């Protein structure tokens, strides 16, 4: 990935619905070159998908929480992940080093809803311990940074 690919990616990250024509004007490339580079990044897997980022509060999920999960034994990992993927309120799951095995990002409607999700998680086979943190405010939320662009 070179400097021009990074420029195109930065523009797409700002607005994935931006046309190749608009991008080409901003970074001074031909439209066909921009389209070709986007297609190459899609086929190579650099661009995995295009998605919609929603405001959780405006979609009814007023609470965001981070939950640390410790499993009793690694043999529970596969089943745990299968089950976590089925729950639409768990929007991210990270496998960790340290005291806990997983960190979940959860978006839910209320404290009661979070409590239901917490009980559901505790009922999964092999869950030994959980620790939950309420998010008071999100200060930064990006999905993947790009390395510093070099010309």
Report each predicted region and the residues it spans.
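A compositional/biophysical signature of low hydrophobicity enriched in polar/charged and small residues
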Residues: 1-151
């Amino acid at each position: 990935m070179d400097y021009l690919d990074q420029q195109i990616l930065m523009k797409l990250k700002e607005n994935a619905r931006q046309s190749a024509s608009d991008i080409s004007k901003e970074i001074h490339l031909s439209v066909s070159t921009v389209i070709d580079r986007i297609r190459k990044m899609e086929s190579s897997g650099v661009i995995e998908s295009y998605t919609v980022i929603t405001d959780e509060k405006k979609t009814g999920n007023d609470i965001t929480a981070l939950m640390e999960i410790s499993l009793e034994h690694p043999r529970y990992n596969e089943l745990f992940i299968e089950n976590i993927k089925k729950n639409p309120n768990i929007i991210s799951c990270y496998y960790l080093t340290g005291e806990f095995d997983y960190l979940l990002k959860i978006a839910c409607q209320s404290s009661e809803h979070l409590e239901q999700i917490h009980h559901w998680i505790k009922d999964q086979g092999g869950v030994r311990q959980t620790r939950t943190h309420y998010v008071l405010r999100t200060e930064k939320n990006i999905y993947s940074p790009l390395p510093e662009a070099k010309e």
